[in-house]
């Protein structure tokens, strides 16, 4: 049986004179990019440059909308009602769609950022509003969402293309959610351990949780990082390991 998987990373998170991440380098190793849309990070010039780099390197572009929280990098919880969430989506995804249009690039997907992502996974009213906003911009844009989450199931029910995402460097609970960053087992730091877990998720549809149980999981795309040279090496190790195991690493626009 042939196995395919996408590798995605959050990019375009610099702002003004401030630089975050090694975007040009990480684009050599991933197949999809989640581009910040100016609220938790990014700005119009960064968005423009990131879409251009993605086109040059053949990396699929996704919108990465977050809460309007530059100071907290979009990681702080906010009280957001459904009408606000829908408008946030239209505003940010629509902006990145315009940059993609200017380069003749297809906007492949949308992936929420930080607290927006985490809350939408477990809050149906917020998830519904997010999907309403996505469909209002373009119903053909895929929703890249936490594997097995409410928002994944609701997007499938609506007929929205769904990319179920897993994480190379994070631990999972028995419920299929990520172990909170403040708890033991939240992070997988050893590259070989991470690779073995990713291979299990991709080829067997299983993952071992922080309690030692094995649960089902769907791995359409694996999130990796490019914050520094160590993260780049980690990402390269995962990609090379997948290829050696016979897994085809490709985005959803380049699959045969």
Outline where the language-model segments fall.
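Acidic (Asp/Glu)-rich catalytic clusters
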Residues: 24-28, 49-62, 101-103
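Conserved, mostly hydrophobic/aromatic
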Residues: 10, 64, 110, 224
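Active-site-adjacent beta->alpha loops and helix N-cap segments on the catalytic face
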Residues: 16-22, 41-53, 121-128, 147-157
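C-terminal alpha-helical cap/extension of soluble enzyme domains
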Residues: 181-186, 190-256
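Hydrophobic, well-structured mid-protein blocks that either form specific transmembrane helices
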Residues: 104-150
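Glycine/small-residue-rich loop that forms an oxyanion/phosphate-binding "nest" at active or ligand-binding sites
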Residues: 69-109
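Active-site rim beta-loop-alpha module in soluble metabolic enzymes
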Residues: 148-206
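Glycine-rich tight-turn/loop motif centered on a GG-T
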Residues: 19, 23, 33-40, 71-86, ...
């Amino acid at each position: 049986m042939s196995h395919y998987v996408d590798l995605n990373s959050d990019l375009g998170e610099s702002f003004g004179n401030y630089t975050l991440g090694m975007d040009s380098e990480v684009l050599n190793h991933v197949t999809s990019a989640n581009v910040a849309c100016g609220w938790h990070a990014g700005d119009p010039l960064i968005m423009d440059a990131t879409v251009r780099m993605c086109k040059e390197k053949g990396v699929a572009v996704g919108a990465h909308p977050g809460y309007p929280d530059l100071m907290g990098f979009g990681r702080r919880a906010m009280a957001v009602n459904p009408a606000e969430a829908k408008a946030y989506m239209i505003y940010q995804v629509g902006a990145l769609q315009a940059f993609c249009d200017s380069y003749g690039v297809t906007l492949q997907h949308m992936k929420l950022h930080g607290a927006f992502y985490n809350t939408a996974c477990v809050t149906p009213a917020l998830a519904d509003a997010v999907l309403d906003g996505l469909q209002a911009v373009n119903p053909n844009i895929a929703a890249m969402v936490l594997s097995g989450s409410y928002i994944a199931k609701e997007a499938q029910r609506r007929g929205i293309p769904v990319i179920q995402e897993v994480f190379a460097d994070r631990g999972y609970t028995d419920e299929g959610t990520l172990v909170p960053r403040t708890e033991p087992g939240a992070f997988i730091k050893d590259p070989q351990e991470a690779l073995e877990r990713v291979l299990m998720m991709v080829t067997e549809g299983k993952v071992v949780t922080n309690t030692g149980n094995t649960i089902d999981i769907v791995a359409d795309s694996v999130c990796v990082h490019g914050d520094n040279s160590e993260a780049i090496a980690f990402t390269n190790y995962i990609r090379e390991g997948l290829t050696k195991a016979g897994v085809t690493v490709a985005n959803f626009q380049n699959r045969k």
